[in-house]
């Protein structure tokens, strides 16, 4: 069982990179975790709705290459379900007990996720109704996974 954190585009801010790496190390204490970064598409200055969909489609295809047929997929989308850290821990425990080969958290790029990712996802999760910088969202996902594992293992991180 592996937790995969799949995201579009490399983080450019050193602070975010350092925080993500720190949380990945902490997560790996409890459970194997793999960060997968797929390339984002260059975005032209003038973009039509059709071109935007083509960009998201190409990024989605790269994401889907890293997801196995029986993996449990959580898509991070603003329209997703907003839950507490305790509920994430409970859900994570249920997903672990269900013996999925992998649990995949998918974070889209600056244009969001393509519809085919929404359709493939088993669960739609929202961090908030607010919009966050891509790097900050990735840090928050990693932190919440670590917090959930800490809750499940009676760690001292969550009080």
Curated annotation (Swiss-Prot):
Pfam families: SPOUT_MTase (PF02590). It catalyses: pseudouridine(1915) in 23S rRNA + S-adenosyl-L-methionine = N(3)-methylpseudouridine(1915) in 23S rRNA + S-adenosyl-L-homocysteine + H(+). One of its GO terms (molecular function) is rRNA (pseudouridine-N3-)-methyltransferase activity. InterPro entries: Alpha/beta_knot_MTases (IPR029028), RlmH-like (IPR003742), tRNA_m1G_MTases_N (IPR029026). S-adenosyl-L-methionine binds at residues 76, 108, 127-132. One of its GO terms (cellular component) is cytoplasm. Disulfide bonds: none annotated. It is found in: Cytoplasm. It is an enzyme of class 2 (transferase). Its EC number is 2.1.1.177. Keywords: Cytoplasm, Methyltransferase, rRNA processing, S-adenosyl-L-methionine, Transferase. The keyword S-adenosyl-L-methionine applies. HAMAP family: 23SrRNA_methyltr_H (MF_00658). Belongs to the RNA methyltransferase RlmH family. Homodimer. Specifically methylates the pseudouridine at position 1915 (m3Psi1915) in 23S rRNA. This is Ribosomal RNA large subunit methyltransferase H. The gene is rlmH.
